[in-house]
Amino acid sequence: MGGGGNLVDGVRRWLFFQRRPSSSSSSNNHDQIQNPPTVSNPNDDEDLKKLTDPSKLRQIKVQQRNHLPMEKKGIPNAEFFTEYGEANRYQIQEVVGKGSYGVVGSAIDTHTGERVAIKKINDVFDHISDATRILREIKLLRLLLHPDVVEIKHIMLPPSRREFRDVYVVFELMESDLHQVIKANDDLTPEHHQFFLYQLLRGLKYVHAANVFHRDLKPKNILANADCKLKICDFGLARVSFNDAPTAIFWTDYVATRWYRAPELCGSFFSKYTPAIDIWSVGCIFAEMLLGKPLFPGKNVVHQLDIMTDFLGTPPPEAISKIRNDKARRYLGNMRKKQPVPFSKKFPKADPSALRLLERLIAFDPKDRPSAEEALADPYFNGLSSKVREPSTQPISKLEFEFERKKLTKDDIRELIYREILEYHPQMLEEYLRGGNQLSFMYPSGVDRFRRQFAHLEENQGPGGRSNALQRQHASLPRERVPASKNETVEERSNDIERRTTAAVASTLDSPKASQQAEGTENGGGGGYSARNLMKSSSISGSKCIGVQSKTNIEDSIVEEQDETVAVKVASLHNS
């Protein structure tokens, strides 16, 4: 496998010796591969619910599915998963989600009777960037064991170590997501708001304690059940910071849905990231619970900054200096003075203590936002918050994410994903760590059987079931990208436009000098930083203008790019 293979084999040998019992090993050595950290007793969540008044914290409405018998769907008796002699484990029921990455089916774990979501990720290794994202997420979800983070139950063993293409991940099945809950429940009580925010902050405290930044928190990435249980999902864009690196780190990709993106990230590929970006996103989600609609539904970078300042007021110079994008920073600096709108006027029915906390969460300056732990100590959570139910953890070991620092081949990533899969197959893992080189297996693989089941489900999914299949009712890894329905939201239409312009954005990534020259010609040498000039920014940012026409409204003419592969091209331009 070349240089990458040496890395993988070396880590594998090292892991074997680390797993051998040793009285001299130190549990405080953070450079060792850490075992999954312990969390609070699962019954703590039951105790948490008892702290609320059951008559007030009623069940929420979630979308219900009609689970028809398999025979009525034209599907024969289910073929069951077989893995190393362990037969009849999962019984596939139906397709509940479908996208360009693969298919999600609901299933029954016949060992426990539990309903699960099984995600088939197609052709994982066609693109190294996608495979790396999948590796990153399954690794993070293995390490971040917490009641408020979605759990991977199992990953199916592939039929061949060196040749597998698809990955099957078994998640706990959640009924809906917070986006759908907010849409379907216009009568959420203050107790609901408090309980939802508490769970988000409790989960985020744990994630941040592991030195992980989620970077894409939004209602669609918060799974929900009718009993008001929330879980954070979709860690494909998350990153880990390490003890030997600065607290604020530069990463060269473009993340976070614009409506929930912190102002210091607006319009920039290259940004300083701190835990405060996740706190801002949680604040926007909390505001959406209170309002019943998004707080900052910006159409583009300029509009996003405008509606933020319309509500929060013009930020002070110190806060403006934190904006990474030069044109956005100058645009804010030249903005007319705006006074903040009182939160009680924007949210007239909200609890005053909730608004005081919200004001801290969405402070324009990141240094003014509390940490998740500090937010949990806010008086808003009096009677609910408890250190016993708010577990922390140790920072994730640097060795777990050594692959992020290397240039890996497809075979390298395949081996690393295989290594992650073995975490759910202890006997095979022991053989692997001893240096076993088994390439194929004696028993029929569950993946082979599942491939046939999914294919049959997809073939028998008629047009009438299409809308159901589009609904997101499962964990990520990664999110689906499907054609939008007629009832799609403004945000979804906007994001679809952004995705369709990916190629155009990539083609405009000329050298800075060429871009500046083109901009100077188009602007006629003007030097002002108006909204139009920001739209035509020559900086390496998400505010690239595609096909600008003079009569086009500025709010419709900025298109941002959210594809990680384009960010990589940007980074290569800077390094060349």
From Swiss-Prot:
- Per the record, a Pfam family? Pkinase
PROSITE patterns, alphabetized: MAPK (PS01351), PROTEIN_KINASE_ATP (PS00107), PROTEIN_KINASE_DOM (PS50011)
Q: Enzyme class, one word? A: transferase
Task: Please list the residues that carry the modification Phosphothreonine.
Answer: 252, 257
Activity regulation as described = Activated by threonine and tyrosine phosphorylation.
Renumbered to this chain, region (Disordered) spans 20-50, 458-535
Q: Where is the composition biased (Basic and acidic residues)?
A: 477-501
List the biased-composition ranges (Polar residues): 28-42, 504-520
Q: Where is the Protein kinase domain?
A: 90-381
Q: Which residues are modified to Phosphotyrosine?
A: 254
Question: Which InterPro entries does this UniProt record tie to the protein?
Answer: Kinase-like_dom_sf, MAP_kinase, MAP_kinase_CS, Prot_kinase_dom, Protein_kinase_ATP_BS
Active-site positions, per UniProt? 216 (proton acceptor)
For this protein, the record's PANTHER family field holds: MITOGEN-ACTIVATED PROTEIN KINASE (PTHR24055)
Fill in the domain comment.
The TXY motif contains the threonine and tyrosine residues whose phosphorylation activates the MAP kinases.
User: What is known about its subunit structure?
Assistant: Interacts with MKK7.
What's the protein called, per UniProt? Mitogen-activated protein kinase 15
Task: State the organism named in the record.
Answer: Arabidopsis thaliana (Mouse-ear cress)
